[in-house]
Amino acid sequence: EIGACAPSISTRERMASEHGIAVFETAAELAEKTDFLVLAVKPAQVEGVFREKGLEIGPEHLVMSIVAGLSTEVLESYVPGGRIVRVMPNHCCMVLEGASSYSPGKNATEADLDRVESVLEAVGSAFEVRESDMDAVTGVSGSGPAYVYMMIDAMADGGVLCGLPREVAIELAAQTVLGAAKTVLETGQHPDVLKDSVCSPGGTTIEGVRALEDRAIRSAFIDAVRASAERSRRMGKGN
């Protein structure tokens, strides 16, 4: 059984009706009912959650945190002896194709990690990483879907510019991204090798690649990942 808490009556009613889950007004009520808690709030709200009157979280609870930028060390300061696992999921979990990463706090056990991994694998793929790499993970897979959505939108715009109906252009672009991603994962070949295999000498694709290189597309993606990772790092420091 899954439960959630929210101070807003309308939010609780919506969660109950849309997802058929048990809902509670306070975190204290929820914590009394389970030993597995998911912390899914904004960084600025974390202290308020843990300072809630009547909330008792201890070593008997496993806390899976998806709070951006917040380290297990900070979370453990609120829950001495607490079993914390930090997680960075992504938007694609909503269609069961998520790319989630997790790293354990100092008190998390192997059984805890197995439990977290099983939850994440129910909505996609899960990767254990060093906590020092979580900001980079945020830049690549956490924020990555937004970059890809922008790319699909831009490719569709290009198709419309060239005469395609909008709905056809979007489906072609999205399916192309899906197929290309599957090709990378299933063949195990380096993306650059696969790119070269599509580019015939003097052909249409290499001309398109040249246009992208003229506009520094690689640097743009690299800078986007770095900017997102740096923002995650600053958020972890409270900035």
Regions found by a protein language model. Give the residues of each.
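Glycine/serine-rich anion-binding loops at beta->alpha junctions
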Residues: M88-C93, T138-V148
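Rossmann-like NAD(P)(H) cofactor-binding subdomain of soluble oxidoreductases
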Residues: I9, E18-H19, T26-Y102, K106
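NAD(P)-dependent Rossmann-like dehydrogenase/reductase catalytic/cofactor-binding core
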Residues: A174-N239
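NAD(P)-binding Rossmann-fold cofactor-contacting core
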Residues: E1-E18
